[in-house]
């Protein structure tokens, strides 16, 4: 049986340090644990999930470009690029793949420079402040949205 939907999960800078980097803000769950849980969830939903974590903006942009034509939805935690990257915004606009922006912490309850996102206004939705669970909610929301449109 072939997968019903193809979803790309992107994680930005420093998320490779999850579990040990400021756990009081980001939790003790590692990125590998988050991705593993999402893969199990996706398999049960007949969804192909691919993943990239990169500290390099260009690698995330290249992955977004490569997704055109073979990806139905993007889940992205742009991390610090949220507040700085017009290039990520332009890449997402360029491929016209719907996406959900994810943040582990509540960015609106943090430093003022974290309150602005270059992506939120073009995202289908934003999930923030729910820790690792936010990824599960985002995957479910993406599949629900795709199922309704097919």
From Swiss-Prot:
Pfam families referenced in this protein's UniProt entry, alphabetically: DHquinase_II
Q: Which InterPro entries match?
A: DHquinase_II (IPR001874), DHquinase_II_CS (IPR018509), DHquinase_II_sf (IPR036441)
Q: Does the record bear DNA damage in its keywords?
A: no
Where does this protein hold substrate?
Answer: 77, 83, 90, 104-105, 114
GO molecular function terms listed in the Swiss-Prot or TrEMBL record: 3-dehydroquinate dehydratase activity
Which residues does UniProt mark as catalytic?
26, 103
State the pathway, as annotated in the record.
Answer: Metabolic intermediate biosynthesis; chorismate biosynthesis; chorismate from D-erythrose 4-phosphate and phosphoenolpyruvate: step 3/7
Query: GO annotations under biological process?
Result: amino acid biosynthetic process; aromatic amino acid family biosynthetic process; chorismate biosynthetic process; quinate catabolic process
* Key words, A-Z: Amino-acid biosynthesis, Aromatic amino acid biosynthesis, Lyase
Does the keyword field hold Transport? no
Its top-level enzyme class, in one word, is lyase
Q: Report the EC number(s), separated by commas if there are several.
A: 4.2.1.10
Q: Where is this site: Transition state stabilizer?
A: 21
Give the catalysed reaction(s), semicolon-separated. Answer: 3-dehydroquinate = 3-dehydroshikimate + H2O
Q: What does this protein do?
A: Catalyzes a trans-dehydration via an enolate intermediate.
Q: What is stated as this protein's family in its record?
A: Belongs to the type-II 3-dehydroquinase family.
Oligomer status and interactors: Homododecamer.
What is this protein called in UniProt? 3-dehydroquinate dehydratase
What organism does the UniProt record list as the source? Yersinia pestis
């Amino acid at each position: 049986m072939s997968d019903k939907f193809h979803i790309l999960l992107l994680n930005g800078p420093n998320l490779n340090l999850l579990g040990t980097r400021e756990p009081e803000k980001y939790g003790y769950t590692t990125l590998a644990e988050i991705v593993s849980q999402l893969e199990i969830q996706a398999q049960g939903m007949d969804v192909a999930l691919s993943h990239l974590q990169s500290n390099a903006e260009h690698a995330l942009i290249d992955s977004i470009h490569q997704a055109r034509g073979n990806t139905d939805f993007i889940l992205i935690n742009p991390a610090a690029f949220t507040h700085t990257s017009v290039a990520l915004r332009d890449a997402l606009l360029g491929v016209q793949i719907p996406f959900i922006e994810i943040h582990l912490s509540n960015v609106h309850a943090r430093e003022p420079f974290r309150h602005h996102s270059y992506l939120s206004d073009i995202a289908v939705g934003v999930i923030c402040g729910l820790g690792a669970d936010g990824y599960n909610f985002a995957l479910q929301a993406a599949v629900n949205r795709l199922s309704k449109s097919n």
